[in-house]
């Protein structure tokens, strides 16, 4: 790759990133040459399932985890202390979810390097799209990467409806950051609309693994870090590979996480959202998770300019219909609600010639006591059940829960989720649906995780809102 790093471009980018400090280069005329070399040779985060059992990456990860577990409780890099950072500070269900976890992963990776002495170490990721079982390196008695609280077994497989390639491709092709990366918020613990990346594969995998992974002390399970590295890979692919802009709203870009993290020596770190934009350009890169054909490879200078610029992103609605009626979902008891729409606007979402979309927002959702079920959404299918295949044309999407309604530490227990019904209603129309009606019948089906008997599988939904969104305008 042509990295396109002129001295002028580098200094502009380094100023925005704080790259000189992060890269450990703070003076002298050799800064540019040394940093250029380091960027070009930055560590590669690889798919853990593609590594041999004795690969140095896996061994370094094991050594790092063992060393963190052996640190005294007074050390901020201690294994439990690292998990408590997540418990006490992590944003979920809002637009700070992605940049906060990006910083969290980076400083954890730095701690691994410091404790093991392996400066070339890069945290691997678990590609649950290609390997739907917990990878082999996380199992075995005496293995620092094992966790005995897991509910999933070595043979358990995550369901394609949550992590399959079709689902991921749809998520990565979502152009609106507020739908992809979760909705607007003014504080990091405020609940907004949960985005499709967080609400579907992210939440599902936490519940699928279970045990420690099912609550906000989830970093106690070493799987956590590779799972979130996959989420990070998704964001990099969405933003830098597929060229979808992040929002440039100053409420987001200028927000500071202070001081949530600690550096490799255990000292507190203050991090601004905009500081994280160039991490995957300057500090690490990924072995490609989702190859995309036909895209021109861009220089790092081009990527840097695009990542920093972002765009003014809105989610505007031409019409919205709200149904307030508390629904209680249990496994084996689907619920249906009819939502009437204005005929002319509804037709605008049915035609491919227009870019209007039909978006369902489920509001004031109270999750189950245990995160051992998820919800599938169907359209005009009153007999839908947990066994209904997701390749049925009436299927629209899924969402899952991370944490239970006992987790009051993380703010309000109520959630909001968004599901795009556009393609489903368009596919149903040629089959005779909506010919004489602009009413949409929505079915919600509670589904248990595979090979698992739900303990307390009740979900309450107090509000359904069906909206016709205007075409996305980026400025």
Regions found by a protein language model. Give the residues of each.
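Intrinsically disordered, flexible peripheral segments
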Residues: 2-4, 8-95, 99-475
């Amino acid at each position: 790759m042509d990295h396109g790093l002129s001295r002028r471009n580098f200094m502009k980018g380094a100023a925005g990133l704080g790259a000189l400090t992060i890269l450990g280069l703070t003076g002298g005329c050799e800064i540019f040459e040394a940093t250029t070399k380091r960027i070009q040779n930055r560590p590669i985060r690889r798919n853990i399932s593609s590594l041999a059992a004795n690969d140095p990456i896996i061994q370094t990860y094991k050594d790092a985890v063992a060393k963190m577990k052996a640190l005294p409780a007074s050390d901020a890099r201690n294994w439990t202390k690292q998990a408590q950072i997540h418990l006490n500070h992590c944003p979920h269900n809002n637009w700070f979810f992605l940049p906060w976890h990006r910083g969290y992963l980076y400083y954890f990776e730095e701690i691994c390097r410091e404790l093991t002495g392996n400066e070339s170490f890069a945290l691997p990721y678990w590609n649950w799209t290609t390997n739907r079982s917990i990878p082999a390196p996380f199992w075995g008695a005496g293995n620092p990467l094992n966790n005995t609280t897991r509910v999933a077994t070595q043979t358990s497989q995550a369901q394609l409806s949550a992590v399959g390639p079709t689902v991921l491709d749809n998520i990565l092709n979502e152009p609106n950051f507020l739908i992809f990366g979760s909705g607007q918020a003014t504080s990091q613990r405020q609940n907004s609309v949960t985005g499709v990346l967080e609400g579907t594969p992210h939440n599902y995998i936490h519940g699928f693994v279970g045990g420690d992974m099912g609550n906000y002390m989830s970093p106690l399970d070493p799987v956590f870090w590779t799972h979130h590295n996959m989420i990070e890979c998704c964001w990099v692919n969405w933003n830098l590979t597929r060229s979808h802009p992040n929002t440039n709203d100053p409420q987001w870009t200028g927000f500071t996480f202070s001081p949530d993290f600690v550096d490799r020596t255990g000292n507190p770190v203050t991090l601004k959202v905009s500081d994280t934009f160039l991490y995957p350009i300057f500090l690490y890169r990924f072995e490609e998770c989702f190859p995309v054909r036909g895209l021109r490879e861009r220089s790092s200078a081009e990527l840097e300019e695009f990542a920093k610029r972002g765009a003014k992103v809105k989610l505007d609605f031409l019409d919205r219909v709200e149904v307030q009626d508390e629904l209680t979902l249990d496994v084996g008891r689907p619920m249906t609600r009819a939502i009437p729409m204005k005929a002319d606007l509804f037709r605008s979402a049915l035609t491919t010639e227009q870019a209007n979309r039909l978006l369902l927002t489920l509001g004031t959702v109270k999750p189950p006591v245990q995160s051992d079920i998820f919800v599938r959404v169907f359209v005009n299918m009153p007999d839908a059940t947990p066994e209904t295949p997701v390749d049925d044309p009436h299927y629209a999407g899924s969402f899952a829960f991370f944490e239970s309604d006992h987790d009051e530490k993380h703010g309000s227990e109520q959630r909001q989720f968004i599901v795009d019904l556009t393609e489903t209603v368009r596919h149903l129309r040629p089959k005779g649906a909506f010919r004489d009606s602009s009413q949409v019948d929505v079915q919600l089906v509670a589904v248990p995780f595979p090979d698992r008997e739900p303990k307390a599988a009740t979900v309450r939904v107090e509000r359904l809102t069906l909206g016709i969104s205007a075409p996305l305008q980026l400025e």
